[in-house]
Amino acid sequence: MACCTGRCTLILLCTLQLVAALERQVFDFLGYQWGPILANFLHIVVTILGLFGTLQYRPRYVIAYAIWAAIWVTWNVFLICFYLEVGDLNKESDLLSFHVSQHQSWWSEHGPGCVRKEAPVAGVAGLESHSYVSVIGCSVEYQYIEVMHSALQILLALLGFVYACYVTSVFTEEEDSFDFIGGFDPFPLYHVNEKSNHLLVKQTSLPA
């Protein structure tokens, strides 16, 4: 079957999602954001599964991808709420790092136009250096960069969900029509062989 519009579009969407997820994974690793790192890893795995299912006409894999797309949208909505401090959420907390470290988003110190300055702490001596870090001159605050990342992920996931449902319905209809004409039904072949054997036995039993 030629590559239909819906199937080709889903392949393109899965590819774009992989590129966006890998880009995001790199910066989450740099910021030690363990929660997003784990979520990105699962997203990459399931997206590859969905891409494989689309290429190999496996509707179950595409369905699994569609279910994950809905979960992925929910996760990114949470991230938007987190960075915009909706309700009791605080973007300065270490929630996304699983309270393992005090690291924040990598963009908080390395965003566009940001200048990072370190001031040593007075009266603190030791082998480890201690300093206050201040960031000034950022063209875009880091929370808005993270929100834009999540918004892009939501857009791609919603489109992927819609096309995954469409492609699944197309695959299912094709399987049903193939079953209807006996494509996967072993009975016709068995029936022909049984009839041939019956005729052979009948011929050998005739008197000479």
Curated annotation (Swiss-Prot):
Its main location: membrane. It is found in: Cell membrane. The keyword Membrane applies. GO terms for cellular component: plasma membrane. The chain crosses the membrane at residues 10-30, 35-55, 62-82, 151-171. It is a multi-pass membrane protein. Coiled coil: none annotated. Belongs to the NKAIN family. Interacts with atp1b1 C-terminus. This is Sodium/potassium-transporting ATPase subunit beta-1-interacting protein 4.
